[in-house]
Amino acid sequence: MMIASFAIFLSHIIFITYATSNQRYFKPNMHNNMTITIRRTITKTATAIAVLHSDNGNINGTIHFQQDKNSTTISGEIKGLTPGLHGFHVHQYGDTTNGCISAGPHFNPYNKTHGDPTDEMRHVGDLGNIVAGADGTAHIDISDKHVQLLGPNSIIGRSLVVHADQDDLGKGVGDKKDESLKTGNAGGRVACGIVAISA
């Protein structure tokens, strides 16, 4: 009788231990699955800023960059410009020791010719034109899929430059064609600033 009772008691212990162990086995898996799902919904966002000015201090502006999954938004305003269109580009170097000329050529990691921002054949740094109103202020709101703040072709540490003239977007003809495919015939550099990581 004692042996039978002990066997029943032992079977209860074994059953209870198995059930408890089974619950402990599934709970971490449920937790891990939830964690993985949450992590997959997180997207990387990066932000940067460029404070632009001219050598004489008459032109000033602040431009903000925000990169999400699909594109980079470029926004802000620049004051003190002559009314009209001005070429707007990211240049190779974050060097302004000799003014904007030290910034080098357009940022062009894929060795393409200059073009319209909507063209596939364009420099990464080609942002087209900005428009200054009668008061000399240009309001900027650009979305660009080529400009990146993350990765090997990041524009962080490079220069953002405003030019004196309108960018012809690589469509120049005749004696202007060669320069059009390099700079868009956008003229001198009137203001610039280094693109830096923002807080």
From Swiss-Prot:
It is found in: Secreted, Extracellular space. Disulfide bonds join C100-C192. GO terms for cellular component: extracellular region. Cu cation binds at H89, H91, H106, H163. Its EC number is 1.15.1.1. Homodimer. This is Extracellular superoxide dismutase [Cu-Zn].
